[in-house]
Amino acid sequence: MSYKLLIINPGSTSTKIGVYENEKELFEETLRHTNEEIKRYETIYDQFQFRKDVILNILKEKNFDITTLSAIVGRGGMLKPVEGGTYAVNDAMIEDLKVGVQGPHASNLGGIIAKSIGDELNIPSFIVDPVVTDELDDVARLSGVPELPRKSKFHALNQKAVAKRYGKDSGKGYENLNLIVVHMGGGVSVGAHKQGKVVDVNNALDGDGPFSPERAGTVPVGDLIKMCFSGQYTESEVYTKVVGKGGFVGYLNTNDVKGVIDNMEAGDKDCEKIYKAFLYQITKTIGEMAAALNGKVDQILLTGGIAYSPTLVPDLKSNVEWIAPVTVYPGEDELLALAQGAIRVLDGEEKAKIY
């Protein structure tokens, strides 16, 4: 069957849209929003009509007939924790997206805009593998402090997309494999995928795991507590040290990993030190996830923007190939991953889940 899909991926200052015919991209646009435009709205939900109009206007400009669409797919937002998969957007989901039950985030608008356009056209609307995807084993939820359970916050959409792609490419099927998926971008998430479920993963936003271009990962917690009560920092300043100004930004004042590697190869010792620590921490976390899978690992998958690195990828491979063979799927194509999630449902390969 042939399907035409409109894909909507809202970010804080832009909305990315794509129109796909099955897995073929017909066109893609990044609609940028100025600070002035965004500032007009008090809450993220208040931006709904503005962003929807911008999307419909660009489709009109391109003379695209929206009545030819089969479904609308939005980026999944900060809902209650759910298991991975493709979800039909329903009223319960819309209510939770409006308030952002796990926090305000532009991606909350994805499902809201998708349902609004879908309902007008009388076609289904979906979200796919939202960032709150949570399939953790119960043992992985305990942190050691009862009030602070471990949370599943990771690059669920891309991790699931490459894991399913490898399942197809290998002919074995995602549900029959044990995989370790390593997403390396602005944050780094390392997930243990056990027969179709992410049973353990580091909280790549503000929890634990390797440091990344902009995030701190696991830090010495006693010292962090002292920092919080030193009187020198506000709460948001400490948070920014962990998310935004951690990792490469903290040490080298840049989030450009490629530039750091170039400098290292030109003899910069500071860059070499940070690069080696970065490589070491990712290696160690892969080892941790191999242990979570009891050493039964079929394949390690590397993905995200940093997986394009001609230096880091061979270095990482040589560190972890003793665990399992390594396959590289560089970059991240969120629009395609969202399209594929909808196609699996429209084709009857998967059932749409109900929120």
Swiss-Prot record:
Q: Which GO terms describe its molecular function?
A: acetate kinase activity; ATP binding; butyrate kinase activity
Query: What keywords does the record list, in alphabetical order?
Result: ATP-binding, Cytoplasm, Kinase, Nucleotide-binding, Transferase
PANTHER family linked to this entry: ACETATE KINASE (PTHR21060), BUTYRATE KINASE 2-RELATED (PTHR21060:SF3)
- Give the InterPro entries listed for this entry: Aliphatic_acid_kin_short-chain, Aliphatic_acid_kinase_CS, ATPase_NBD, Butyrate_kin
- EC no. given is 2.7.2.7
Location(s) in or outside the cell:
Cytoplasm
Q: Which top EC class applies here? A: transferase
One Pfam annotation reads Acetate_kinase
On whether ATP-binding is a keyword of this UniProt record, the answer is yes
What name does this protein carry? Probable butyrate kinase
Alphabetical GO CC annotations of the entry are: cytoplasm
NCBIfam families given in the database record: butyr_kinase, PRK03011.1-5
Predominant cellular place of this UniProt entry's protein: cytoplasm
Q: Which SUPFAM superfamilies match?
A: Actin-like ATPase domain (SSF53067)
- UniProt similarity note: Belongs to the acetokinase family.
Q: Which reaction does it catalyse?
A: butanoate + ATP = butanoyl phosphate + ADP
GO terms for biological process, alphabetical: acetate metabolic process
